[in-house]
A protein has these predicted regions:
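Glycine-rich hexapeptide-repeat left-handed beta-helix
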Residues: 2-3, 8, 13-48, 54-56, ...
Length: 166
């Protein structure tokens, strides 16, 4: 299915699967296999500055809101995820709408809207409240380091070189 869109500044790590069901049949849209974001229809929509961690899967129809972290081996299927959400590793979110600023604990299976509505809110005390920002930052540093190497520079491992004598 198409279109599949990944927003600006998003991070798609190794082993991620983005897939969708058929979105056209005999030249006509298959509405049940599309999500609407901003008035446009998508098979899979990944917002801006989203992290899709190793081996996570987003299977359409699905939408993942801006600034969201989808953890390692997590699954989003036929679901809409709000902005600023953390889906911890191994969680499965199927057929629901997750409100903004919530987290899904590791290994959870969320298959009813009542479960989705009852998800805990992200607060300052939540240990992964800023996880997505950190993941985006470190991966941006990796990308910059790779570009520097490609241009003939020396690797700094993504970190600044220490001053001489230190």
């Amino acid at each position: 299915g198409q279109p599949i869109v990944v927003g600006e500044g998003s991070n798609v790590q190794d082993g991620v699967v983005l897939h969708a069901l058929e979105t056209l049949s005999e030249g006509e849209p298959v509405a049940k296999n599309l999500v609407t974001v901003g008035g446009k229809k998508y098979a899979v929509y990944i917002g801006k500055e989203v992290s899709l961690a190793h081996q996570s899967q987003v299977h359409g129809p699905a939408a993942v809101g801006d600034h969201t972290f989808v953890g390692m081996q997590a699954l989003v299927f036929k679901a809409t995820i709000g902005k600023n959400v953390v889906i911890e590793p191994g969680a499965k979110v199927i057929g629901v709408n997750v409100p903004e600023k919530r987290y899904i604990p590791a290994g959870s299976v969320i298959t009813t809207q009542a479960q989705a509505d009852a998800l805990p809110e992200i607060t300052d005390s939540y240990p992964f409240a800023t996880l997505n920002e950190g993941v985006l930052h470190v991966n941006e540093a990796f990308a910059d380091a790779y570009l520097h190497l490609e241009e003939g520079g020396e690797s700094t491992g993504g970190a600044e070189k220490p001053a001489a004598g230190h």
